[in-house]
Amino acid sequence: IEIESNKREVKKWYQPIIKGSKLAFAGFIIKEFNKTEHYLCRHILKPGSKSSTFTCTANTSNLDTYKYNIDLTISQKKIIHKYFMNRRSNILYNNILSDEGGRFFHSQIRYMACKLKKDENINLPKNYIWLSKNQIITLIDEQKIDIEARLLFGIVNFKGII
């Protein structure tokens, strides 16, 4: 589409609008250790990136077909099913937002956060780690947390600062 703006260095340009899947997913599992909330994060290397980053506990580009997605590990599929699709889970946040502010045509992401009970444990799959709030903030400063995880982390913690 053609874009015109008097608020940018370039006044006119053509912006590609990418059609993604209708509903993607990003979710955090949260658990308290030693009176401090920790977030279960996954260590990843995204295509085109020079260095690795951390992301949410679970992500998929299409929530409707996650069970059949060959790019998701069995562990990721089990996590989505057990903690985010289970009505008995302690869901702290569940909302649908436009993907990257509407840059992707009619594409949305369901963001969810689930808090484990104190006595509830999870077997950590390969590349997973529990990170505290302070560790995540430090990693955000170092640009080591991806956009979905930054957004969900901010949303989950926003109500605590107002």
PLM regions and their residue ranges:
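Compact, glycine/acidic-enriched structural inserts
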Residues: 47-91
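Core of folded catalytic or high-affinity ligand/protein-binding domains
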Residues: 6-49, 56
